[in-house]
From Swiss-Prot:
It comes from Hydrogenovibrio crunogenus (strain DSM 25203 / XCL-2) (Thiomicrospira crunogena). It catalyses: D-glycero-beta-D-manno-heptose 7-phosphate + ATP = D-glycero-beta-D-manno-heptose 1,7-bisphosphate + ADP + H(+); D-glycero-beta-D-manno-heptose 1-phosphate + ATP + H(+) = ADP-D-glycero-beta-D-manno-heptose + diphosphate. It holds the Pfam family PfkB. The lineage of its organism: Bacteria, Pseudomonadati, Pseudomonadota, Gammaproteobacteria, Thiotrichales. Catalyzes the ADP transfer from ATP to D-glycero-beta-D-manno-heptose 1-phosphate, yielding ADP-D-glycero-beta-D-manno-heptose. Residues 1-316 are annotated as: Ribokinase. This is Bifunctional protein HldE. Pathway: Nucleotide-sugar biosynthesis; ADP-L-glycero-beta-D-manno-heptose biosynthesis; ADP-L-glycero-beta-D-manno-heptose from D-glycero-beta-D-manno-heptose 7-phosphate: step 1/4; Nucleotide-sugar biosynthesis; ADP-L-glycero-beta-D-manno-heptose biosynthesis; ADP-L-glycero-beta-D-manno-heptose from D-glycero-beta-D-manno-heptose 7-phosphate: step 3/4.
Length: 480
């Protein structure tokens, strides 16, 4: 999957904003006043919550984001503004006497002991002013994200949706409550399974969920539903397409606080950049698997997401990695100071000589890219009887090696064009070549890189293996 450049994507986030405070420390004894633990507070920090956390997630992915909501001219509001300014999030507020919502959590040993909420109802006049502000600005954005926490800022959400639709701006909604009809006309609504079943009733199984989702889409006149299902992954159901079911990618779950914010933020950023809805959902699923490994309200950066995609591709055998995808991963590695090594070959009938060579190549740096000749390229080099193993199989075998980070195919006789594009730090070739005879060497040198020649291990050859197999078949035929 390609990671788009999100820097030109403009997203407007509107909804219930709040400040999340965290006090943490050691709980070493029980209070003599009541049967509750005493926490000796050692650390205090504040984070943006609710719709503000959605905006932070979008900013961390590199998109241009503006946040609109209702806050108070109070200390909580001041702290929230500081967090947003540090993250580069622009904001337009409706100020209200109801104040800024704050949720204070007390933790010990990463376990939440208690949460205290500071909040008042948002006045209707403030909510009306917010809807008017959205209508005035929404045309300037690629996507409108509505983050509903049922705190009162979205009393006129219908007007916001209609304003966006009139400007052909997609509307993605993270919902709340048991009345989804107020979201009529939205592009997508993203409930979790509990919120979804509150509307449609308990789902007996996955097929039942899909059927009920299709019915709800028709009833409330939206284009799609994305049902997040915790450890069961996600289900995307579109009006004019089939269902897309994604398994959960999370291996460890420490805290689900704000995970829904990350999902809607990643989905909106990807969709706003031009990706299809299914591809955007896949990206959001990867982001969710990252954020649940963090404690408290957190975000996922573009670098973290790209690294997660890298791990996902490795798990899947790299069957669909493109040059652009590998190029992106190489750039990320180099930006972190990692030395990227490049080598190439046909790798037909992978043998221990190949494995030893690749291990030695990997030791020349931190990351190893292996470029593999396509089937057509192998035929040009080896003749019509080759390859023995098709490209997909050769790539899968190579990707299973722990020394190999990324595998990418090429169609030409040499990988010179690919080398010039990827710009590795070290170019490695096996055999008795002189460095200046190696395809792509000049490109690497021009960019300050190194070229290394490694020895092949004697006695290992795919051609020799093929000859032995043919000899064995001849002998077996003669014996019969």
């Amino acid at each position: 999957m390609n990671m788009h450049d999100f820097s030109k994507t403009k997203i407007l986030v509107v909804g219930d904003v709040m400040l999340d405070q965290y006090w943490s420390g050691r709980a070493g004894r029980i209070s003599p006043e009541a049967p509750v633990p005493v926490v000796k507070v050692a650390d205090e920090n504040v984070r943006a919550g609710g719709a503000a956390n959605v905006a932070l997630n979008i900013a961390d992915l590199g998109a241009d984001v503006n946040l609109m909501g209702v806050i108070g001219q109070d200390s909580f509001g001041q702290q929230l503004n500081q967090v947003l300014e540090q993250a580069g999030v622009a904001s337009n507020w409706v100020y209200s006497e109801s104040g800024t919502i704050c949720k204070l959590r007390v933790l010990s040993h990463h376990q939440q002991l208690i949460r205290m909420d500071f909040e008042n109802a948002v006045p209707e006049l403030s909510a009306k002013s917010l809807a008017k502000l959205v209508a005035e600005k929404v045309a300037d954005y690629d996507v409108l994200v509505i983050s509903d926490y049922a705190k009162g800022a979205l009393q006129f959400v219908e007007e916001m949706i209609q304003a966006a639709k009139s400007q052909q701006v997609p509307v993605l909604i993270d919902p709340k409550g048991n009345d989804f009809s107020r979201y009529a006309g939205a592009t997508l609504v993203k409930p979790n399974q509990g919120e979804f079943e509150l509307i449609v009733g308990v789902c007996a199984d996955q097929d039942d969920l899909i059927e009920k989702a299709k019915q709800l889409i028709q009833e409330i006149n939206i284009d799609a539903l994305l049902v997040t299902r915790s450890e069961h992954g996600m289900a995307l159901i579109e009006k004019d397409a089939g269902a897309t079911i994604l398994k959960s990618r999370a291996q460890e779950v420490f805290d689900v606080t704000g995970a829904g914010d990350t999902v809607i933020a990643t989905l909106a950023t990807a969709f706003g950049s031009g990706l299809s809805m299914p591809k955007s959902v896949k990206l959001a699923n990867e982001a969710a698997s990252i954020v649940v490994r963090k404690v408290g309200t957190s975000t996922v950066s573009k670098v973290e997401l790209e690294e997660q995609l890298n791990a996902s591709m490795r798990h899947q055998g790299y069957a669909s990695m493109s040059e652009d995808e590998v190029h992106s991963l190489v750039q990320i590695a180099q930006s972190k100071g990692e030395k990227v090594v490049f080598t190439n070959g046909c790798f037909d009938l992978l043998h221990s000589g190949h494995v030893r060579y690749l291990n030695e190549a990997a030791r020349q740096g931190d990351r190893l890219v292996v470029a593999v000749n396509s089937d057509e390229s192998v035929k040009l080099l080896k003749g019509d009887s080759r390859p023995i193993v098709e490209l997909a199989g050769r790539m899968e075998l190579l990707s299973a090696l722990s020394c190999v980070d990324w595998v990418v195919p090429f169609n030409e006789e040499t990988p010179e064009r690919l080398i010039c594009k990827l710009a590795p730090d070290v170019l490695v070739k096996g055999g008795d070549y002189k460095p200046d005879e190696i395809a792509g060497a000049q490109c690497v040198w021009d960019k300050g890189g190194e070229v290394a020649v490694l020895s092949f291990w004697e006695g290992y050859s795919t051609t020799r293996m093929v000859d032995k197999i043919q000899e064995a078949e001849i002998k077996e035929g003669a014996a019969q």
